[in-house]
């Protein structure tokens, strides 16, 4: 199972003071050295963390691959066509949210998403859709031509009781099986950390987990390379 390291919150810390540090590009290179299989960045409409310059620099220096998260807007579509990342993940986005709060409603806007997927695919990118583990959304993702999906694990991460955790984990298990059964590459992420990742990493059929906030938080105490290496070891062991 692959580990995609999201470096958005390295940029969050930088933007909090408007400084040039910490540098998310350095974090990305350190993550690669520590075993990351790819680097994920989300260029938001409000530019609250990652900036265009970060994406341009990362495209030039990464040894692995970039997973570029973006909202379905003309501005982002044009930027993605210019940058041409290896992977593009379409996500829902509102200015008021602290972080992405739910999956993209593909079923409710199939024509719009289909047009975006087709346009972005012409850049050579593998396009994925960030969706809830819901059969209706998974089927819609296949219909619009996306080769990959990323299942939103936030409800699992936020579950408080053992019963809720088990229910949300089962929802992910079923979503993965349904997606794989429909010929899709299935990734997952959101809210995963060192104490809840193993159960998800043990699910057969998941191609990649994308993790960011927990890594950046842990790196404050152990360093970025150590934080990434520790997470990678947990995922590899659980997915055997």
Curated annotation (Swiss-Prot):
This is Pyridoxine 5'-phosphate synthase. GO terms for cellular component: cytosol. Its EC number is 2.6.99.2. The keyword Cytoplasm applies. Keywords: Cytoplasm, Pyridoxine biosynthesis, Transferase. It comes from Pseudomonas putida (strain ATCC 700007 / DSM 6899 / JCM 31910 / BCRC 17059 / LMG 24140 / F1). It holds the Pfam family PdxJ. One of its GO terms (biological process) is pyridoxine biosynthetic process.
């Amino acid at each position: 199972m692959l580990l995609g390291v999201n470096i958005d919150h390295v940029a969050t810390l930088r933007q909090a003071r408007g400084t040039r540090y910490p540098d998310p590009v350095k974090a990305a290179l350190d993550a690669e050295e520590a075993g990351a299989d790819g680097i994920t960045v989300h260029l938001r409409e409000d530019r609250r963390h990652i900036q265009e310059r970060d994406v341009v620099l990362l495209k030039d220096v990464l040894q692995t691959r970039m997973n570029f998260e973006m909202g379905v807007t003309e501005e982002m579509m044009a930027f993605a066509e210019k940058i041409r990342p290896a992977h593009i993940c379409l996500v829902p986005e509102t200015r008021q949210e602290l972080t992405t709060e739910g999956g993209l409603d593909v079923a409710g806007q199939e024509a719009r998403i289909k047009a975006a997927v087709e346009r972005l695919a012409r850049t050579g990118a593998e396009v994925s859709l960030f969706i809830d583990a819901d059969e209706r959304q998974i089927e819609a993702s296949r219909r619009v031509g996306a080769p990959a999906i990323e299942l939103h694990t936030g409800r699992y991460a936020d579950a408080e009781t053992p019963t809720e955790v088990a229910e949300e984990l089962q929802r992910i298990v079923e979503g993965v099986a349904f997606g794989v059964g429909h010929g899709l590459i299935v990734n997952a992420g959101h809210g995963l950390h060192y104490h809840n990742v193993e159960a998800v990493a043990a699910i057969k059929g998941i191609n990649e987990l994308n993790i960011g906030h927990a890594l950046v938080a842990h790196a404050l105490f152990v360093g970025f390379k150590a934080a990434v290496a520790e997470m990678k070891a947990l995922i590899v062991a659980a997915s055997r």
